[in-house]
């Protein structure tokens, strides 16, 4: 094994975990998921079936990533970030996996603590989602968004945030 797995974590069958990745306490990685190298998966994280996570990704504690989510390399997910995969869940109906909506988090994005990412959206590369934001639509590359619903308030230019409001 070329990665670290805490004894309380669970990794289901057919998962691929990259070299030097660390998986901490009470984390569950569901079947057929792929996690790249040099990742840090915090405590009490749930990763659903068929999720793909790139290299050098940091996922803080209490994050939920459901089937249909792809996270590219160099992404930061703050504590308690939640991804959804069904826009209108109903307890009395079974949702078929073919109806899951896909979410893509592109390279270098930062998701602040307690963000909720509604399914079917793309989070642009190098974008920043402020803590507590609820993302209900596409986030452009290099955008800074905050709020509920999240709205663009700035842009990253030459590595620095510039306000647009």
Where are these regions (language model features)?
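C-terminal/domain-terminus segments
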Residues: 123-138, 144
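Acidic, glycine-centered active-site loop in nucleotide-sugar glycosyltransferases
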Residues: 141, 148-149
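Flexible, glycine/small-residue-enriched loop-and-beta-strand segment within the central core
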Residues: 1-7, 23-123, 149, 154-162
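Short glycine/serine/threonine-biased micro-segments
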Residues: 16, 40, 110, 118, ...
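Compact Cys/His-rich metal-coordination microdomains
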Residues: 140, 165
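Glycine/alanine-rich phosphate-binding loops at beta-alpha junctions
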Residues: 19
């Amino acid at each position: 094994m070329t990665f670290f797995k805490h004894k309380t974590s669970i990794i289901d069958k057919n998962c691929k975990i990259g070299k030097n990745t660390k998986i901490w306490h009470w984390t569950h990685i569901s079947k057929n998921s792929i996690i790249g190298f040099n990742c840090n998966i915090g405590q009490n994280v749930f990763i659903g079936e068929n999720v793909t996570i790139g290299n050098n990704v940091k996922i803080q504690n209490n994050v939920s990533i459901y089937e249909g989510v792809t996270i590219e390399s160099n992404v930061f997910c703050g504590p308690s970030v939640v991804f959804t995969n069904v826009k209108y869940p109903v307890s009395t109906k079974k949702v078929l996996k073919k109806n899951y909506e896909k979410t893509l988090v592109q390279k270098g994005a930062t998701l602040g603590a307690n963000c909720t990412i509604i399914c079917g959206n793309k989070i642009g590369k190098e974008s920043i989602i402020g803590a507590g934001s609820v993302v209900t639509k596409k986030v452009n590359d290099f955008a800074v968004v905050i709020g509920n619903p999240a709205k663009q308030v700035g842009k990253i230019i030459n590595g620095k945030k510039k306000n647009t409001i």
